């Protein structure tokens, strides 16, 4: 069974970061080792929250403990998401290097959390710079949203063709695979939720219905998306098949959440539909 070291935020109530990705990844059939960058009472789109950012050296200490019991070599991928401080970033890169030193076949999947296309940047100073300068070159897979794609590539993206070009700019700097988690205003249609999966040689586009939650959009969708893609790829699915499953699985979670009238993602209620979606969305190869 595959093992994923997932370094992300954690909320006690609700679903964001590891709290959004950990259960779905396990439900898909992999082991997850959650390592939390922050621990908050709830996600930060509520009016208030409590909690703290973990000390940066805490991340390294935990991984060192795993290494000392000779289990780090069984880690197949490191997944990083929300980073609570720029200092944590340096420790995460060191962790990736430690894992790859004992398992050269391990992947680093970077979810470069900077913000939401409609909300602007939500991370502390220094994190965006770390992601561009340090995380991008060592990542094997990276999964930006539209704003993050523009920041990482230093290109304005207004359509799908430009998004593919920007993603290939990232491939030239490090990762083999780029998932654009949400094309937003750069997509073909504003009433659809569109994603791209891009390599140096090929690209695929997938579109699904946009589930309208009004002004109160659920948080953690990107974390769920990244986790599901990583699991699919670790299990040996093709890029196209993996993208199609992610689109359908996330749609099932969104529809279930909408049907139940909830704000928090209903990942437990939707678990069976997530693993075996009722809907199918075909990924179209662009080149």
From Swiss-Prot:
CDD domains: pyridoxal_pyridoxamine_kinase. One of its GO terms (cellular component) is cytosol. Pathway: Cofactor metabolism; pyridoxal 5'-phosphate salvage; pyridoxal 5'-phosphate from pyridoxal: step 1/1. GO terms for biological process: pyridoxal 5'-phosphate salvage. Its cofactor is Mg(2+). Substrate binds at residues 9, 44-45, 223. The keyword Methyltransferase does not apply. Its EC number is 2.7.1.35. It comes from the Bacteria. Keywords: ATP-binding, Kinase, Magnesium, Nucleotide-binding, Transferase. It catalyses: pyridoxal + ATP = pyridoxal 5'-phosphate + ADP + H(+). ATP binds at residues 111, 143, 148, 181, 208-211. It is an enzyme of class 2 (transferase). GO terms for molecular function: ATP binding; magnesium ion binding; pyridoxal kinase activity. Pyridoxal kinase involved in the salvage pathway of pyridoxal 5'-phosphate (PLP). Catalyzes the phosphorylation of pyridoxal to PLP. Homodimer. Belongs to the pyridoxine kinase family. PdxY subfamily. PANTHER family: PYRIDOXAL KINASE (PTHR10534:SF2). This is Pyridoxal kinase PdxY. It comes from Photorhabdus laumondii subsp. laumondii (strain DSM 15139 / CIP 105565 / TT01). The gene is pdxY.
